[in-house]
Amino acid sequence: MLLAKRSLISSDGIQMTKNRNLFYLFVIVGIFVTRVLFDVVNQIEVHFDEAQYWVWSQNLSLSYLSKGPLVPALIAISNKVLGQTYLGLKFFSYVAYLGTVITISLAAFKLTNRKESFYIALSLTALSPAIFILGGIASTDIFLFFFWSLTILCYVCFIQERDEKWFYFIGITTGLGILAKLTMVLLPLSI
């Protein structure tokens, strides 16, 4: 008697087995670990911008000079959980790097409905020098990339589904992006 593997149907109608989901999880964890190991192996020191955000995280406020409160708030949270460590400083930057890679890959998949597009976008985004380097620096830029790409993904979903709920998500992601870097305000104006 043949037993079929239990499969899951995603919202896009793509059939995924548990093994494939495990593979995706392995790839995502691999990208995250590679990014962290790059800093460890190359002994990347704390950047002066990161030191500035770390000081701000010790004295939280609604804004800092020309910067929003998101980065210092995230550093404060990670320092509470992970302590005053290198990983405590950079944890959310690594998460934003990973989120940017996944979000751009999902947008590519949604636009083409081809798995190859997802993997190509995943590879190119993960290895993009700007995103890769900024993914290891606790500054506003990687969060700008993350929320920018998340807003684009929400816009693609709106175009395809014509559901007004995506406008709320566009507003939320744009607002969070503005809390990271004011340049984010240009995205809705350009769409």
Q: Residue locations for each model-derived region?
A:
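Short helix- or helix-capping micro-motifs
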Residues: I28-I31, F118-A126, T174, I178
